[in-house]
Amino acid sequence: MHVFRPVPYHCQWADRDLVDSIVSGRVDARADAKQGTFCFGDPDEYEFWARRTCGLACLESVLDVLGIAKPSRADLLKQAMAHGAYRLDTGGAVQGLIYRPFLTWVKNAFGLSGRVLEYCTLDAVAQELDSGSLVMCSVSPEIRRPDESNVRRGGHLVLVHGCDVDTIRFHNPSGFRHNQENVVLPRTTFERFFAGRALSLPILENVR
Protein backbone atom coordinates (compact mmCIF):
# COMPACT_ATOMS: atom_id res chain seq x y z
CA MET A 1 0.00 0.00 0.00
CA HIS A 2 1.30 3.44 -0.94
CA VAL A 3 1.02 5.60 2.19
CA PHE A 4 2.88 8.88 2.41
CA ARG A 5 3.12 9.07 6.21
CA PRO A 6 0.83 8.85 9.25
CA VAL A 7 -1.94 11.40 8.79
CA PRO A 8 -3.76 12.85 11.83
CA TYR A 9 -7.53 12.51 11.78
CA HIS A 10 -10.02 15.35 12.23
CA CYS A 11 -13.77 14.92 12.58
CA GLN A 12 -16.53 17.28 11.46
CA TRP A 13 -17.95 17.22 14.99
CA ALA A 14 -16.00 18.15 18.10
CA ASP A 15 -16.77 14.86 19.86
CA ARG A 16 -16.05 12.09 17.38
CA ASP A 17 -17.71 9.56 19.68
CA LEU A 18 -21.08 11.23 19.06
CA VAL A 19 -21.12 10.94 15.27
CA ASP A 20 -23.16 7.74 15.18
CA SER A 21 -25.81 9.25 17.44
CA ILE A 22 -25.87 12.65 15.71
CA VAL A 23 -26.16 11.20 12.20
CA SER A 24 -28.91 8.81 13.30
CA GLY A 25 -30.81 11.64 15.01
CA ARG A 26 -30.58 10.18 18.50
CA VAL A 27 -28.50 13.12 19.76
CA ASP A 28 -28.75 16.81 18.84
CA ALA A 29 -25.34 18.18 17.87
CA ARG A 30 -26.07 21.24 19.98
CA ALA A 31 -25.66 18.98 23.02
CA ASP A 32 -22.04 18.22 22.09
CA ALA A 33 -20.12 19.17 25.25
CA LYS A 34 -16.88 19.58 23.29
CA GLN A 35 -18.23 22.05 20.74
CA GLY A 36 -16.41 24.95 22.39
CA THR A 37 -13.12 23.69 20.94
CA PHE A 38 -14.39 24.70 17.49
CA CYS A 39 -15.09 28.29 18.67
CA PHE A 40 -18.43 28.82 16.95
CA GLY A 41 -20.59 31.61 18.33
CA ASP A 42 -23.36 29.43 19.73
CA PRO A 43 -24.72 25.87 19.61
CA ASP A 44 -27.00 26.64 16.66
CA GLU A 45 -24.10 27.88 14.56
CA TYR A 46 -22.06 24.84 15.54
CA GLU A 47 -24.89 22.45 14.66
CA PHE A 48 -25.47 24.12 11.28
CA TRP A 49 -21.85 24.12 10.14
CA ALA A 50 -20.49 20.92 11.66
CA ARG A 51 -22.33 18.77 9.13
CA ARG A 52 -21.11 20.96 6.24
CA THR A 53 -17.38 21.29 6.87
CA CYS A 54 -15.96 17.95 5.78
CA GLY A 55 -13.49 19.81 3.56
CA LEU A 56 -12.18 21.87 6.46
CA ALA A 57 -11.69 18.74 8.55
CA CYS A 58 -9.64 17.26 5.69
CA LEU A 59 -7.66 20.49 5.43
CA GLU A 60 -6.82 20.36 9.14
CA SER A 61 -5.30 16.91 8.64
CA VAL A 62 -3.18 18.21 5.77
CA LEU A 63 -1.99 21.19 7.79
CA ASP A 64 -1.04 18.88 10.66
CA VAL A 65 1.04 16.69 8.33
CA LEU A 66 2.91 19.79 7.20
CA GLY A 67 3.31 21.18 10.72
CA ILE A 68 1.43 24.36 9.78
CA ALA A 69 -0.36 26.12 12.63
CA LYS A 70 -4.10 26.35 12.11
CA PRO A 71 -6.82 28.52 13.62
CA SER A 72 -10.06 27.18 15.08
CA ARG A 73 -12.63 25.48 12.87
CA ALA A 74 -14.86 28.56 13.09
CA ASP A 75 -12.01 30.86 12.04
CA LEU A 76 -11.09 28.54 9.17
CA LEU A 77 -14.69 28.73 8.00
CA LYS A 78 -14.71 32.53 8.17
CA GLN A 79 -11.57 32.66 6.04
CA ALA A 80 -12.95 30.13 3.58
CA MET A 81 -16.19 32.07 3.19
CA ALA A 82 -14.31 35.34 2.72
CA HIS A 83 -12.50 33.73 -0.23
CA GLY A 84 -15.63 32.21 -1.74
CA ALA A 85 -14.85 28.60 -0.86
CA TYR A 86 -18.24 28.40 0.88
CA ARG A 87 -21.27 30.50 0.02
CA LEU A 88 -24.39 30.96 2.10
CA ASP A 89 -27.36 32.25 0.11
CA THR A 90 -30.23 34.32 1.43
CA GLY A 91 -32.39 31.23 1.84
CA GLY A 92 -29.82 29.56 4.08
CA ALA A 93 -28.54 27.05 1.52
CA VAL A 94 -24.80 26.39 1.47
CA GLN A 95 -22.65 25.97 -1.61
CA GLY A 96 -19.29 24.42 -0.97
CA LEU A 97 -16.68 23.32 -0.70
CA ILE A 98 -16.00 25.18 -3.98
CA TYR A 99 -12.70 23.86 -5.23
CA ARG A 100 -10.92 26.65 -7.07
CA PRO A 101 -11.62 29.42 -4.53
CA PHE A 102 -10.56 26.93 -1.86
CA LEU A 103 -7.20 26.38 -3.56
CA THR A 104 -6.67 30.13 -3.95
CA TRP A 105 -7.39 30.61 -0.26
CA VAL A 106 -5.09 27.84 1.04
CA LYS A 107 -2.30 29.08 -1.23
CA ASN A 108 -2.62 32.62 0.13
CA ALA A 109 -3.24 31.66 3.75
CA PHE A 110 -0.92 28.67 4.18
CA GLY A 111 1.35 28.58 1.13
CA LEU A 112 -0.30 25.29 0.20
CA SER A 113 -0.32 24.42 -3.50
CA GLY A 114 -2.92 22.11 -4.99
CA ARG A 115 -4.94 21.32 -8.07
CA VAL A 116 -8.40 20.22 -9.08
CA LEU A 117 -8.86 16.75 -10.56
CA GLU A 118 -11.96 16.51 -12.74
CA TYR A 119 -13.37 13.37 -14.34
CA CYS A 120 -10.65 11.42 -12.57
CA THR A 121 -10.37 7.71 -11.93
CA LEU A 122 -9.04 5.92 -8.88
CA ASP A 123 -5.94 5.12 -10.93
CA ALA A 124 -5.41 8.87 -11.25
CA VAL A 125 -5.86 9.24 -7.49
CA ALA A 126 -3.27 6.50 -6.97
CA GLN A 127 -0.83 8.35 -9.22
CA GLU A 128 -1.27 11.48 -7.12
CA LEU A 129 -0.54 9.49 -3.97
CA ASP A 130 2.55 7.97 -5.57
CA SER A 131 3.80 11.46 -6.39
CA GLY A 132 3.56 12.49 -2.73
CA SER A 133 0.10 14.06 -2.55
CA LEU A 134 -2.86 13.70 -0.26
CA VAL A 135 -6.16 13.67 -2.12
CA MET A 136 -9.54 15.00 -1.02
CA CYS A 137 -12.09 12.89 -2.92
CA SER A 138 -15.76 13.67 -3.45
CA VAL A 139 -17.86 10.69 -2.38
CA SER A 140 -21.38 10.08 -1.17
CA PRO A 141 -21.76 10.41 2.62
CA GLU A 142 -23.39 6.99 2.35
CA ILE A 143 -19.85 5.60 2.28
CA ARG A 144 -20.10 5.31 6.06
CA ARG A 145 -22.34 2.31 5.32
CA PRO A 146 -20.28 0.63 2.58
CA ASP A 147 -22.17 -2.66 2.71
CA GLU A 148 -25.44 -0.97 1.76
CA SER A 149 -26.55 0.23 -1.67
CA ASN A 150 -26.07 3.94 -2.32
CA VAL A 151 -28.32 6.25 -4.31
CA ARG A 152 -25.82 9.00 -5.12
CA ARG A 153 -22.19 9.84 -5.72
CA GLY A 154 -20.44 12.90 -4.36
CA GLY A 155 -21.53 15.53 -1.86
CA HIS A 156 -18.96 14.72 0.83
CA LEU A 157 -15.17 14.92 1.06
CA VAL A 158 -12.85 12.28 2.48
CA LEU A 159 -9.05 12.42 2.68
CA VAL A 160 -7.37 9.59 0.77
CA HIS A 161 -3.85 8.88 1.98
CA GLY A 162 -3.08 5.36 0.84
CA CYS A 163 -3.86 2.73 -1.77
CA ASP A 164 -2.69 -0.46 -3.37
CA VAL A 165 -3.89 -2.47 -6.34
CA ASP A 166 -7.08 -3.54 -4.59
CA THR A 167 -7.81 -1.10 -1.76
CA ILE A 168 -8.10 2.58 -0.79
CA ARG A 169 -7.21 4.00 2.63
CA PHE A 170 -8.83 7.22 3.81
CA HIS A 171 -10.10 9.35 6.68
CA ASN A 172 -13.85 10.02 6.75
CA PRO A 173 -14.65 13.21 8.71
CA SER A 174 -18.23 12.04 9.26
CA GLY A 175 -17.64 8.32 9.60
CA PHE A 176 -19.12 6.28 12.40
CA ARG A 177 -16.79 5.55 15.31
CA HIS A 178 -15.61 2.27 13.78
CA ASN A 179 -14.92 3.70 10.31
CA GLN A 180 -13.64 7.24 10.77
CA GLU A 181 -9.87 6.92 10.70
CA ASN A 182 -7.65 4.91 8.33
CA VAL A 183 -10.66 3.27 6.71
CA VAL A 184 -9.68 0.60 4.17
CA LEU A 185 -12.18 -0.34 1.46
CA PRO A 186 -11.88 -2.33 -1.74
CA ARG A 187 -11.42 -0.03 -4.71
CA THR A 188 -14.55 -1.44 -6.29
CA THR A 189 -16.55 -0.46 -3.21
CA PHE A 190 -15.04 3.03 -2.96
CA GLU A 191 -15.71 3.58 -6.66
CA ARG A 192 -19.47 3.15 -6.13
CA PHE A 193 -19.50 6.29 -4.00
CA PHE A 194 -16.82 8.29 -5.86
CA ALA A 195 -17.96 11.19 -8.05
CA GLY A 196 -14.74 11.40 -10.08
CA ARG A 197 -13.83 14.79 -8.58
CA ALA A 198 -10.94 15.47 -6.24
CA LEU A 199 -8.43 17.97 -4.89
CA SER A 200 -4.77 16.95 -4.95
CA LEU A 201 -2.52 18.58 -2.36
CA PRO A 202 1.15 17.81 -3.17
CA ILE A 203 2.59 17.36 0.30
CA LEU A 204 6.18 16.83 -0.81
CA GLU A 205 6.13 20.17 -2.65
CA ASN A 206 4.70 21.92 0.40
CA VAL A 207 6.98 20.55 3.12
CA ARG A 208 8.76 23.47 4.76
Language-model features and meaning:
Residues L63-D64, I68-R208:
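Conserved active-site-adjacent core of cysteine acyl-enzyme catalytic domains
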Residues M1-A93, E148:
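Active-site-adjacent structural segments surrounding the nucleophilic cysteine of cysteine proteases
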